Amino acid sequence: MRHAQFARILIIACLLIVVNASAQNVQLYVSSQAGDRLTARSGGSFQEKQASGAVSFEVDDSVHYQTIDGFGASLLESGLMVLNALPRERQENVLQSLFDPKEGSGFSAMKTELAGTDFQAAGPWYTYDDIPGDVEMKHFSIARDLGPNGMATYIKRARKYGSFALQAPMDYPPDWMLFDVNNNQDVNPKYFPALARYYIRYLEEYKREGIEIDYLSLFNEPFSVYTKIPYEKIRVLLRDHMGPALAKSGLRTKLMLSEAPERGEAGRYYPIVLNDPAARKYVAVIPYHGYDFKNYDKIAELHRRYPSLPLWMTEICYAYEAGTPRSMSLPVYEFSDGDFWGNVIMNDLEVGASAWIYWNMILDEKGGPWAISVVHGNPDPNEQHPVVIINQQTKKVSYTGLYYYLSHFSKFVRPGAVRVKTTGSSDGVRAMSFVTVQGTMVAQLMNSRKQDVEANLGYRGKQLHVMLPALSISTATWSR
């Protein structure tokens, strides 16, 4: 009798364990037009599937796509200048909100720049060696980057709160390396060895400061926007100069091809470099910018042609100079604007992007300050939209809709996560899923409609029923 009772108890216990395991409790995090801001909620659990009129999606974690490298924005002088205007404790609070993976967004992929660009506003236009003809880099200096508003300082302060991959492109080399800064901004090939030396010195000087640049991108928006070097010459510089120089240097930095301003331009010009095996062997990542806000198919095609190379979307923003209509007031404070950016992030991820990096992380209430150097393509005015707005008069810190939508990805889809197959579609409602390094499932659910939407998320024969608030992003997490 005792044995029979024990057997019944054991069977019941096992059944309870099975039922509990199959329930798969879900944690939900919501940001919405109604006022939720990464708000934690119980998401219920996966249950037996039932027919309903809800929008339906299905997750298949047996089908894997790209590995995620990270999400973030750019570290530039203008942002640190604005941040430094706050009391020190509040400065640290802002940095924590951006980089701390537990208490903040956990930004995990960041961009900086080699010297001058349009938001290096702590001084006049500069490079690291502005002494004409100094091919041996005897006057090379990163002194400005070490100042209170400098990029090296910014990077160090950010890394107090979290780790992140760091990539760095260059708008222009020193003017004396160009044929003519006013009339022909192409690089004179006789300076290719000196330019390779310039890149290496930058990496070495930053390493001496405890900062290893993970990826160096030869040029930022070359040929059509900044340095007017054609891709045929970028191929030569990469293949015959910079690639071999970096290989001999002992540095662990890897190379990115260069960063086209638009997806369409990337699709058109990148094969000039990548179809040369001797040049391609030095390329670790294919970066591109998103200023056309379309042509995602061109990135999908690059992914099909060069499947072994990760794709990074490394710059995008609202900017009048980049085509944002003047009827839109910049910067944008409305939370609802985040929906636009959430869709852009999903679009890039769907065509294979492994990282997504916005341009200015912090700016003031005027969308600045910006640097002015017309000859280098830095106009005045140049208002842009950041992730975080800090009012220089009131000292109010405003976290934009972009901040929250981007945070749903950076906080929950950590580096090493893999995007998995998610099917189902409905106008204005989207879903995308990932499996993390720890084996946790993450689903991002976006509702772009102006009314609440019921949704079902299917997984391994079960179904999760959730209510998606109007204009919202919801992150669901559960154990596999």
Spans of features found by a protein language model:
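Active-site cleft segment of glycoside hydrolase catalytic domains centered on the general acid/base Glu
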Residues: 172-276, 295-304
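Carbohydrate-binding surface patches
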Residues: 408-412, 422-460, 467, 471
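C-terminal beta-strand-rich structural cap/linker in extracellular carbohydrate-active enzymes
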Residues: 468-480
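Structural recognition of the beta-strand scaffold that forms the well-ordered cores
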Residues: 69-77, 108-114, 118, 165-169, ...
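Aromatic/acidic polysaccharide-binding cleft in carbohydrate-active enzymes
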Residues: 313-405, 421-424
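Bacterial Sec-dependent N-terminal signal peptides
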Residues: 1-25
